[in-house]
Amino acid sequence: MSPIGTVAAVWRTLASSLLPVGLLLAVASCGSETTDNPDPGTAFSLVDEDCPGEAVPTRLTVSCHRLHLDHGTLGVAVLWAEDPTGLPVLHLHGGPGGRAVADRYRWLVPRSQVLEGHDVVLVDQRGGGTSTPSLDCPELDDPATPPGEAIQACRYRLDQKGVDRGSVTVGSTAADLVHLRRSLGIDAWHLHGVSSGTRIALELLRIDGSSVASAVLDSPTPPEVDLYDDLPEGVLYALTSMENLCRADATCPGGLVGPLRSILDDLADRPVAVTIWSGEASAYDDARLIRLVADALAAPAGLNVVDGAVALAAEGRLAEAIAALNEVASTGRSVGDPTSEGARLSSECADELPFNDADPMLTGDPILDAVARGEVKVRALCAVWQVERSPDIVNWPMVSDVPTLILSGHLDPITPTAWARRLADRLGNAVLVESERWAHAPSMSDPCAAHLVARFLDGERPLSGFARC
């Protein structure tokens, strides 16, 4: 039994012998308490706390904690398997600036197969979720405020509070998780990284690889790939893959890529003010629309929405198209949403953008150019945010022989399949599984991908190639 599983067993025994059933269920679904908490003011101490939000109905014990570090605190949740047979699993959420603790229900309802044999550790990485200080930017809530002005206001507020905006980087986040592992008394664990969380996982392999038994990299972002430079071709590949599917299914007789090119070409010359559900008018140019299309296609339901939305836009019904895309796109903003915009900016502006071409090349293809113009907008925001560039090592390729499962979907416009293939070629003990029907982060939404992850963490090694379940 793993160290963390041993602690869980002790807690279960004490709870069942000392607590009434009602209190036992409360402990199991929210925060479990112990009497030997370290001093909350001590650096690198882990203390218990109530779980945030509503309790999630489950038979499993779920405990929540706060890891106190020298820069602030991290929110942590542990989902305790009833009878763990393998090492614990650290889940690394995407973003940057995402969250995991408030989204623990995604593991519990329905219960993930991983929890049949493994405890799962969830952590809100620095700057996001319930971790402190938060780099969330509620200033972005007002759609009438230009993004640059909103980011400037957020920066000013954080600076007035003494928050170090440059503290959220790949390197610092990975170092936090080494402290978390030690604080939990874990000698070795599995990693499950999703999207940008895969980059944190790769950094953990670099700095703490002897403590990693295996890694699952779902929709990976390899450090050596210049993400912004490569993304236009990746978005086009995902859209072309979707067009191939919808033509085969006879759901887009008019095509997808051609009509979208025409729409984007018009918006590049003449942005359109669209009235959104709140009644506010919002301007859409080609860069903003392609980002919304990509966000929608990346979502689990995107395959069923994007082709219809493009058809609506091609008919001149842009507002209806945008409303349909917004229904499925993951475009959360500030308080209570899944994304801390400041944490995302800090990491992107320090870890990624400086290593990309400062002057994106326009090709004349409306899709490629719309994506490239999005990078120009991010650079403008980084100029406002102003954080230092990370050391060059953050951009070096990772080499490891740790057993690794890589998952990639051909419909993923956020982390294209080409990146996964490149990473698989470099890692010495990796299996790459692809699917033409997966989009972004399939292990969190697709039953086949989730099953492959659970089997891999239990020691089974799937065959490389297309998913066979």
Feature map (PLM): residue ranges:
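Flexible "cap/lid" loop of the alpha/beta hydrolase fold
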Residues: 221-239, 308-311, 318-332
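C-terminal motif of bacterial Sec signal peptides marking the signal peptidase cleavage site
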Residues: 27-29
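Gly/Pro-rich cap/lid or specificity-loop segments adjacent to the active site
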Residues: 36-287, 346-348, 352-469
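Long, low-complexity segments enriched in small/aliphatic residues
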Residues: 319-352, 357
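Structural motif
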Residues: 272-291, 297-302, 334-342
